Amino acid sequence: MIGTRMARLALEYFHIEDADTYRDLIAFVECDRCLADAVVSVAHCHLGKRRLKWYDYGIMSASFYDIASGKAIRISQRQDVPRCPKGEDVVAFFNQFSDAELFHVHEVELPDFMEYDLPGKPRKTQICETCGERVHDGRGVEKNGHVYCKRCAGEHVYYVEGAELTAEQIAAGV
């Protein structure tokens, strides 16, 4: 419910009447909880459309950037908002609070936001000189005049790669 209210508040602030057809809103969510799903559902900002950015801060907040106006706001949950008691109707519980009682809203600037972060087709594609994989949207790492993906450049990645699977192994499954 918190994410739904945040997204609705952002749409209201930017005077967006039809989120389904509006293409100039980008959302930045700061957690991987239900808030993120609500922002996708209400504001129609999708990861695959490059209109949703996720930052793993573990915080129930989201920022919204309107490309058309160049303005951005960050909406965060006030800490004095009580939790919905177990067994109560979540919608009814949170509807008793105004947006001002639920949220802090601040204008923000996005200093790390780049042209490459905008929705649309990749503006730049590079090939990693080590593994040969395509690196899109300015995410390549340049070292000594060479371009690498983050993994090959030695930056932390979330996995350790094992042996490549054959077509037979894939068909057989786990």
Regions found by a protein language model. Give the residues of each.
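Short cysteine-rich clusters marking metal-coordination/redox-active sites
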Residues: 128-132, 149-152
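Short, non-ligating residues that shape and space the ligands of small metal-coordination modules
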Residues: 137-138, 158-159
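C-terminal edge-of-domain segments
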Residues: 50-83
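Conserved phosphate/anionic-ligand binding catalytic regions in large, soluble enzymes, centered on
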Residues: 1-10
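A structural-propensity feature for long, helix-poor, extended segments
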Residues: 23-57, 61
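Cysteine-rich micro-motifs
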Residues: 142-155
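Short Cys/His-rich Zn2+-coordinating modules
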Residues: 103-116, 130-135
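Short, flexible, mixed-charge glycine/proline-rich loop motifs
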Residues: 113-125, 138-143
